[in-house]
Amino acid sequence: GFYAVYPSLEDTDRIRILIGISTGSDTFKMIEQGNAPTQQDLRFSHAETKKTVEGLVQQEMELSEDTRYVEEGVHKFIEWIRSGKLVIKAYPSQNIHAKLYIMTFKEDAIDKGRVITGSSNFTKSGLEDNLEFNVELKNPGDYEFAQNKFNELWKDAVDVSEKYVETIEQKTWFSDSVTPYH
C-alpha cells in the first residue's frame, strides 16, 4: 500500500514504522522448542527477527499488483530508506497488533501533533479495499501518551530497514536477476 500513500508523505521529514512479528508456523515451532507457554513470553533474536521480516517482505511483494504505480512505490520506498527518511524496526518480543499513526507537526504549528488509531493496516487492503474504522485524536494528552509508548517500544526494536531493501532487491520480482527468460 506504500505506493498509494507516499505522494502525501513527500514533504514529511522523517517516517518511523514499527512492526510486530506475527505468529506463523515457524514461530510456533520456536515456541514449542523453547517451551514458551505464550507468544507474550517469546523473544526473537535479532537474526530471527530479520529472517521473519524477510519472509514477510517476500510475501508482500508476491501478493503485490504488477503495475507501474507499485514499481514506482517500491523505488521510492528504497530511496527513502537509503536516505534515512524512512526507518523500519520490528519489535522482537510481542506481536504489535495496534494500528497507530502518529503525526508530529513542525515547531511553529498550533499543536504538537495528532494520532490516528483504528483498524487500518498500512497495506493496500487496509488503505483501499477493506471497510475500516479509524479515529483521529487531537487531545495533546493522547498525542503525548502515544508518542511516549511508541518511543519506549522503538528503543527495544530491531532495525530491519536494510533487510527490507536487501530482500526486495535480491529475493523478489524487483531483483535485477529476475528476467522473463530466467
Predicted regions and their residues:
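PLD/PLD-like phosphodiesterase catalytic module centered on the HKD motif
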Residues: 1-182
